[in-house]
Each structure stands twice: as C-alpha cells, then as structure tokens.
C-alpha cells in the first residue's frame, strides 16, 4: 500500500507560514511573495477541482536546515508524479517505494567512487539532509501522472530566491548541478563566492551516459568530500543507513 503523500486542501499556505525565519527572509521580496501567493492559489483551485497533488510536504527540504547549515546543494526539477513517491526532497523516495531510475544511478555512482561501499538498501535521503545537504526541487509540487504540471506557475521564482539566499551565505557551499535545468541556476551564484560548482548530465537513464559530461563517472561525491576536507569540514557520509550506527569515517574521508 503506497504511503499517502497527497497534499491536503488548505494546508500549503500554513506550511509556508511555518517556515523558519531564515528561509522566510527569501520570501519577503514583493515579486517572490506574489509568485508564492499565485502558485498557492492555483494549487488550491486544482485541489478543489479534484486534482491529486504531490507531495504532502512541499517545503520539507527546508525543515531542520537553515541556510547557514547547508554544505551541499543538489537541485532537482520537479517531484516524482506517482502515488507514494515524492516526499519533498529532490530524488528521494520512501524506503518501501520502488527505487526510481535516477536514484539508482546516483547510488551506483556513489558505490563506484567509494570502493567497497555497499549500495544503500533504503531510498530515503533524509540522512543526507541531516548532514547539511539541501535537496531542492525547483518546482515544489506536481499533479498525479503529469510531470512538470506546476512548472512556470511561480515555483521557480520562489526557489530561485531560496537558492540565492543560500548562495549569498558567507560560508562556501558545494553546488551539484546535474542537467541543463539545474545548470541554468548557476547565474544565481555570486562571482568569487568560493563555492564549489560541479556540473554533469542529469542522472536519468536518458542522459546519464551521454557525452560530453556523463553523470556516470563524474566523481562528484568524492570531489565534494575532498573539498570539504580541504576546508577542515567533516565529509558527507553518502551511504551509511541511519540505523547502521556511527559514520564510517574511513570510507568517506580521505
């Protein structure tokens, strides 16, 4: 039985209002506030018309993680559009959900980079967010069976503001930009900010092996950890399940 991840009527505005003050700062500009109000109004209208919208918690990527806490940014496009899949984190699905092809390629790439590390059994990437990885889709909702159905409805204005807020933080971040859609967001990153920007194709099977910048073989996860170590910061444990105990520093360090 799929997890019920449907957005409920009259909950989206309240979720936005409950965001931590650090994120709220990105939503105060008049153009951003108008875009957010517009997309909320559209979604509420679609829900009233009987549409099924995912996920139940569109702002989950921002929960428990302030802009200053972010160490790595991974951008997705829009949520998975099937029942029980999207959970508000880019590329992530619940553990009991069938692993999507893009996530399968992400895990395969991680296993390639960290020799001897097993593929994760679970699909929920919450463990990454707890280490400072922001998993942000540029469109935060989608209708059942209709990919990109809420694109160009205002979400991009909102998420551009969130990305800009993170990029302006004084602490350098690593930005993993996979595919043309994510790479277009590089213009939001200030020059001379010290950020690490890594680009490759999207991990989808349609593009993961395509030259000139295939995702498979990109080395991004190890490069992020090497960059963090150079700055005296703890590397990201990309594999250990949350119930497996302590982080395996030997595998994910240098």
Swiss-Prot record:
Q: Which Pfam families match?
A: UDG
User: Would you name any one GO CC term?
Assistant: cytoplasm
Disulfide pattern: none
Q: Where in the cell is it found?
A: Cytoplasm
Q: List the catalytic residues.
A: 78 (proton acceptor)
GO MF terms, alphabetically ordered: uracil DNA N-glycosylase activity
Single Gene Ontology BP annotation: base-excision repair, AP site formation via deaminated base removal
Catalytic activity from the UniProt record = Hydrolyzes single-stranded DNA or mismatched double-stranded DNA and polynucleotides, releasing free uracil
**Annotated function:** Excises uracil residues from the DNA which can arise as a result of misincorporation of dUMP residues by DNA polymerase or due to deamination of cytosine.
Protein name per Swiss-Prot or TrEMBL: Uracil-DNA glycosylase
Q: Give the organism the record lists.
A: Bordetella petrii (strain ATCC BAA-461 / DSM 12804 / CCUG 43448)
- Name of encoding gene: ung
């Amino acid at each position: 039985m799929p997890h019920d991840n449907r957005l409920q009527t009259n909950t989206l505005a309240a979720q936005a209002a409950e965001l931590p003050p650090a994120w709220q700062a990105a939503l105060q500009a008049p153009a951003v506030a108008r875009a957010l109000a517009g997309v909320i109004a559209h979604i509420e209208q679609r829900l009233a018309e009987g549409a099924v919208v995912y996920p139940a918690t569109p702002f989950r990527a921002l929960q428990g993680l302030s802009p200053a806490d972010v160490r790595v940014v991974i951008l997705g496009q829009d949520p998975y559009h099937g029942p029980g899949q999207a959970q508000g984190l880019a590329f992530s699905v619940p553990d009991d959900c069938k692993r999507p092809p893009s996530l399968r390629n992400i895990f395969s790439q991680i296993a390639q980079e960290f020799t001897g590390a097993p593929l994760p059994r679970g699909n929920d990437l919450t463990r990454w967010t707890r280490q400072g990885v922001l998993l942000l889709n540029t469109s935060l909702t989608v209708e059942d069976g209709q990919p990109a159905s809420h694109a160009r409805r205002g979400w991009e204005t909102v998420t551009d503001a969130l990305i800009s807020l993170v990029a302006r933080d004084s602490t350098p971040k690593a930005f993993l930009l996979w595919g043309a859609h994510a790479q277009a967001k590089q213009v939001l990153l200030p020059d001379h900010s010290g950020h690490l920007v890594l680009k490759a194709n999207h991990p989808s099977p349609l593009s993961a092996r395509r030259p000139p910048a295939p995702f498979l073989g990109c080395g991004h996860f190890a490069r992020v950890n090497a960059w963090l170590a150079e700055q005296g910061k703890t590397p990201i444990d990309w594999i250990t399940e949350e119930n497996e105990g302590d982080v395996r520093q030997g595998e994910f360090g240098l």
